[in-house]
Amino acid sequence: MRLVILDDYALASEWAAKYICNCIIQFNPGPDKYFTLGLPTGSTPLGCYKKLIEYHKSGDLSFKYVKTFNMDEYVGLPRDHPESYHSYMWNNFFKHIDIDPNNAHILDGNASDLQAECEDFERKIKEAGGIELFVGGIGPDGHIAFNEPGSSLVSRTRLKTLAMDTILANAKYFDGDLSKVPTMALTVGVGTVMDAKEVMILITGAHKAFALYKAIEEGVNHMWTVSAFQQHPRTIFVCDEDATLELRVKTVKYFKGLMHVHNRLVDPLLSMKKN
């Protein structure tokens, strides 16, 4: 497990974007070999998406041979609703890059058969060869995707009831009106993300500090679903200083001492430009 600690949100976002960029380029995707990327929503990845858009617009990165699978989607919210995760992904990322819309997979929270929709999503991931890199964020209660506290750590894509903490946290996107916030969602399972060849989790802000502590300094616990990734062979937690406030001093010192190693993963930033 790697813990990459950057000074602030902007630097953490840039490091994560550089890492994604280098992973895609080193994979050398093509028409017969697509790179599969798992993606989150929420406020945390926005900075990372902005940097990836920059790399695309500068000609350093193409998403032509990338397939994406998003973590989750609300149930019952129209696809074109401004707060649906379809809208979020297209407005904040997809419409700014060269991805084929057919290769951007997002769960359909309005499907007539939600169970079949979840099973189909798992099948599509398998047919794509599995996820190369799954990027995620977490909530203050340590949930990843919508795998709320108490979720099975071997769970698959399924319908979930949202915890009140999550509904309250999401109310800001719905004019503070709890009655407008969806109470159900489709989400990949912890096991779905664990199956990825590599997982990168973005954690920023002091309000996520206790969750980061639970994620890496205590044992695996289904009440803090992000802790499951202690057992993944290739997990990277990318955080800012504020997110480390609950960690032991020696933990922070140990991982900061490895930054020269971590920075080799993103420096130099690779490019798809032809020389």
UniProtKB/Swiss-Prot annotation:
GO terms under biological process: carbohydrate metabolic process; glucosamine catabolic process; N-acetylglucosamine catabolic process; N-acetylneuraminate catabolic process
Sorted alphabetically, which Gene3D superfamilies does this protein's record hold? 3.40.50.1360
Q: Does the keyword Flavoprotein apply?
A: no
Q: Is this entry keyworded Hydrolase?
A: yes
Cell compartment(s), UniProt: Cytoplasm
Summary of the function given for this chain in its UniProt record: Catalyzes the reversible conversion of alpha-D-glucosamine 6-phosphate (GlcN-6P) into beta-D-fructose 6-phosphate (Fru-6P) and ammonium ion, a regulatory reaction step in de novo uridine diphosphate-N-acetyl-alpha-D-glucosamine (UDP-GlcNAc) biosynthesis via hexosamine pathway.
> What's this protein's family per the entry?
Belongs to the glucosamine/galactosamine-6-phosphate isomerase family.
**Gene Ontology MF terms in the entry:** glucosamine-6-phosphate deaminase activity; identical protein binding
Sorted UniProt keywords: Carbohydrate metabolism, Coiled coil, Cytoplasm, Hydrolase
Source organism lineage?
Answer: Eukaryota, Metazoa, Chordata, Craniata, Vertebrata
| Residue ranges of coiled coil | 102-131
Q: What is this protein called?
A: Glucosamine-6-phosphate deaminase 2
Please tell me where this protein is predominantly located: cytoplasm
State the GO CC annotations: cytoplasm
Listed under subunit, the entry gives: Homohexamer.
EC number(s) recorded for this UniProt protein: 3.5.99.6
> Organism source for this protein?
Xenopus laevis (African clawed frog)
Q: Where does the source fall among the domains of life?
A: Eukaryota
Catalytically driven reaction(s): alpha-D-glucosamine 6-phosphate + H2O = beta-D-fructose 6-phosphate + NH4(+)
InterPro entries documented for this protein: Glc/Gal-6P_isomerase, Glucosamine6P_isomerase, Glucosamine6P_isomerase_CS, NagB/RpiA_transferase-like
Q: Where is the active site?
A: 72 (proton acceptor), 141 (for ring-opening step), 143 (proton acceptor), 148 (for ring-opening step)
Under the heading SUPFAM superfamilies, the entry gives: NagB/RpiA/CoA transferase-like
